[in-house]
Amino acid sequence: MSETYTIERDLNELEAMVNNLDTYVRGETLYGNAGGSGFFSGNKMPSLTVGAVLMRLRRLDMLRDQMDSKQQQRFGASVDKHAHIAGEWRVHYTGKMNREAHSRLDAMRTFFEECSSDPKLCANVYRPEMLRRTIVQEIRMAMDEINLEVEDEFKQKLSGTDSQ
């Protein structure tokens, strides 16, 4: 993530993700595609996940006052579409949230286990783990916002990760 952040790119990614969210939440794939895939497409879109959408929604909401009116309209449309899909497919949507949170925490556990044998390497490749943890936090906050019961196993994994 050495590229410079832009609201426009973040908004484009959000729109692509939300436009594919309906099909994604009903499917089996955990790390989906936001469109434009293929070897020759030059697609640099991040994976489509509920957590990735939630992170962009929150980040762009915090930056709303820096958007021009067209960007604000596009953002509002994405917020509305996301809310509609999350409500219409609630069971599928929350199922994906849970699966993603566990998957990301499991990946982090593996990372920390590998770090114990090579701390120098760990310091050099920590950035993806920060993103994983950020997305897990977005999922956790969304669970609270929709009053979704949080499993004890998830709480334990989260606590274990944070104690590393």
What are these model-derived regions, one by one?
Residues 1-38, 105-116:
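Short terminal alpha-helical segments
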Residues 1-5, 39, 87-94, 137-145:
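Charged, low-complexity surface segments at secondary-structure and domain boundaries
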Residues 3-9, 13, 41-45, 67, ...:
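Non-transmembrane, amphipathic alpha-helical segments
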Residues 12-15, 19, 51-54, 58, ...:
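Generic structural signal for well-ordered, non-transmembrane alpha-helical segments
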Residues 22-25, 29, 61, 83, ...:
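Generic secondary-structure transition motif, activating predominantly at the C-termini of alpha-helices
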Residues 32-78, 121-153:
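Amphipathic, non-membrane alpha-helical rod segments
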Residues 63-101, 154-162:
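Repeat-associated, polar segments at repeat-unit boundaries in modular proteins
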Residues 84-126:
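Long, mid-chain structured domain cores
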